[in-house]
């Protein structure tokens, strides 16, 4: 059995070819490229697309211009590939702001391309810039928005349960003082103290999700639904958490 989260050699070659094309077309160098989304989290469906995210740097003369230049590269989304990149200076600014999405990218289990020395130095800075306060708010807000938007009917799109459950477990992880939540859902779930019946329901739903299509609908899951509701209510009163971000700006230069 091959997990849907694996990337076969043909798709990996296609992604790498796309990255080479980006380097030539935009005159940049890709320093890091990974999977975000369901394949990075570890609960992809057979027909999940590939969410490729990358960090890139321009040639020196680009940084000497007076006018600010566009710092994002976005390609048109096709039936399988969703490709988007952030310029390196923008990425450093996001780390300075303790952006949880950016921090997740650096923990992706699926890496297509990497300047190991540069990216290792960047990863080493994460603990100094990570903000429990900002991360917890990011994950809680995401869960609340997705719950209100996708899980209100008696029949729901099954994948959306994970778009509420994962950020809620990440918020709990942060509240428990464990630091940066792991990107992989399996690690996040293993580190969460959930009752056996709830864990069994999540495992069963995960199996369905990995077997069914992205658009699969099913009846509301009462036990899981009740847990999500209770966590969202509990989260309305945020705990006192440090903002941290004790990093040295000189390290980002």
Regions found by a protein language model. Give the residues of each.
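Helical scaffold of the NTase/Pol beta-like nucleotidyltransferase catalytic core
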Residues: 1-34
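Conserved aromatic-histidine-acidic binding/catalytic patches
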Residues: 3, 7, 45, 79, ...
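Catalytic metal-binding acidic patch
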Residues: 37-78
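Short loop/turn segments at secondary-structure transitions that flank enzyme active sites
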Residues: 58-61, 98-101, 145, 170-171
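A basic- and aromatic-enriched beta-loop-alpha substructure that forms the phosphate/nucleotide-
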Residues: 65-142
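Conserved nucleotidyltransferase catalytic core and NTase-mimicking acidic/glycine-rich helix/loop elements
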Residues: 123-250
